[in-house]
Structure formats: C-alpha cells, structure tokens
Amino acid sequence: MATKISKALLLAMLMLGTSLVMFAPPADAQAAVAYSISFTNGQVQLDVRPGASGIGCTEMVISNEGQATIDVDISLSGGGVTISPGAVSVTLAPGGSITVPVCALALTRSSYKTVQVNALASGRETNTQLNQVNKNAGFAVIVQQYARLSVQASQPFQKIGPGKEFVLNFIAVNNGNYQDTIAVEVMNAKDLEDAGFTVALAAAQYQIDASGEQPVQLTVATPRGTVVGW
C-alpha cells in the first residue's frame, strides 16, 4: 500500500516549522526489520533572486521491504537552508510505502552555494520496538547564482575646456550573490571619437565580490579649438 502527502500541506508546515507524523495500517510482524529510504530527485534548485520564492522540493520515499510492521523515525538537516519537515515518523505494514514531499527554503539574496541535506532514519519492529536498523539518504540543495549590477558616476556632470584631458570616475556595485566578472565599455565611444574626443578605459573588465564595489576610471581628452562645455 502506498501513501502520498500533498505539497500544499508541506508548504503550510514549512511556515509553521512542525514535524510530520504519519500512519499506514499495520499487519502482524513476521520477520526482521527491512526497509529503504530514497529521494526522487537528487538535486533541488533554489531561485533566490529578489521576488523569487527561494523554495524547492523533492519527495522522500520510505518502503517496508520486510514482513514485519515497522516504525521509522527520520530526521532531516542541511546547513544554511531550512528543511521542512525536519522530522518524519511513520508506521508501515509489510510491503507498505509512503511518499513525503520535502522542501528546502533559502532567504532571498542568499549566497550562491551547494548544501548537502542528510536524512537519518531509525527503523524498529512495531510490537516489540526491537531489531533497530539505521539507514541514511540525502540530496543536494543548490542555491542558484544570479547577477545584478549597478553603476553610478562620482560626478554626474563635469565641465572642461577644449584640448584638455580629464578622468571620469564611476562606481560599479555587484548586487548579485557571488563574485562576478564585469566587462566595461563606452556605449557611444564611436560618436565621441568621430567628434574628436579620445576615450580610454583603465581596464576592460573587473572581478567584483558579492556586495562589493569597484572604481572604474575613464580618461577623456577633448578636441582642440572647440567650445567649452560637455
């Protein structure tokens, strides 16, 4: 006999932080404890971009492979993410199985990382609570990387005369959740060069840590014999 728990129930539990206790109809104990525990998906991806849920789910399958009715207690843990349910207790008749949705939650803008979730199970014969058998299984949770960048000028407006060279300073900010490599270019460089300006970047690309800032310099030389004011 197989039992399946709805994801709607599990997501409600994710907010309440409760444990899950389930029961499948028992039968008379006939033999030693034998069971299996597995996950239907070995990897769960979490989207933690602003506006995303940060939630990803898989399913845990517990099957009684013996001839005795058994009690199985399972604890789940994963550093850096919230796992729900954190504990599951089931009673399974011989040949019975149960499928339990298991969800992981990471906060919005969490750092990019991979977390291993471990499920530790302890199974015993129901009537005597003897013949304990321990099992373990697990899955990986990947907090996905995302990139976001903002740029601002140190001086939004600057006035200089003809035939002069000056340096424009910008600040690039990595608003993503991991180190990013950014490429820098002047979008209207050709128009400026056609007008007689010389434009030079201090560097074509930079590496910026998450939440880090990077100064970006641009050197501009104005053409000679032109009016003041750019």
Identify the residue ranges that each predicted region occupies:
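Secretory targeting signatures
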Residues: M1-A32, M60, F170
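Long beta-sheet-rich domains in secretory-pathway and surface-associated proteins
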Residues: P25-W230
